[in-house]
């Protein structure tokens, strides 16, 4: 029990530097421009990193261009993007930190149980940022806001994945 209390404190500490309202606004406005492209986002991740696709039993070993048009692919892409949308919607308000922690904690635990590594999380991040930056107005301010947001999330997730 003590372990979980310490882990919770570490995770809360990792997100103790929440986004400013300006950073949150930049992340939210850029995300709003792409969040309805769920299939394209997941396709971009799988195309860039086939080893991530291989981690999904329902997609492993299948032709990406073929599965991209399937309902199963669209459903899973929507799950991933909806999770990100929920985190982003909560960002920018310190009063939402416990809700953000709860979401990150569950996602981290679920992915730890599936054997997902820090390397795979980082690959996902790279592909996600590549997709967003290629599809929205992307300046240094937007890049910095996304870096801050993802650093917060990934620091917390890595504390869970490596625990």
From Swiss-Prot:
Belongs to the globin family. The keyword Iron applies. The lineage of its organism: Eukaryota, Metazoa, Ecdysozoa, Arthropoda, Hexapoda. GO terms for cellular component: extracellular region; hemoglobin complex. This is Globin CTT-Z. PANTHER family: GLOBIN-LIKE PROTEIN. It comes from the Eukaryota. InterPro entries: Erythrocruorin (IPR002336), Globin (IPR000971), Globin-like_sf (IPR009050), Globin/Proto (IPR012292), Mb-like_M (IPR044399). Transmembrane segments: none annotated. Heme b binds at residues 76, 111. The keyword Membrane does not apply. Residues 18-162 form the Globin domain. There are at least 12 different components in Midge globin.
């Amino acid at each position: 029990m003590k372990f979980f209390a310490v882990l919770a404190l570490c995770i809360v500490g990792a997100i103790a530097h929440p986004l400013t309202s300006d950073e949150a606004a930049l992340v939210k406005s850029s995300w709003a421009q792409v969040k309805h492209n769920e299939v394209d986002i997941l396709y971009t991740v799988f195309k860039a990193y086939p080893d991530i696709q291989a981690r999904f039993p329902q997609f492993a070993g299948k032709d990406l261009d073929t599965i991209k048009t399937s309902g199963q692919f669209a459903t899973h892409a929507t799950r991933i993007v909806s999770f990100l949308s929920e985190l982003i919607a909560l960002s920018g308000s310190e009063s939402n930190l416990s809700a953000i922690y709860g979401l990150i904690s569950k996602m981290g635990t679920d992915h730890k149980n599936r054997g997902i590594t820090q390397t795979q999380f980082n690959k996902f991040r790279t592909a996600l940022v590549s997709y967003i930056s290629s599809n929205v107005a992307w300046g240094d301010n937007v890049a910095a806001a996304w870096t801050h947001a993802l650093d917060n999330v990934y620091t917390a997730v890595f504390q869970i994945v490596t625990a």
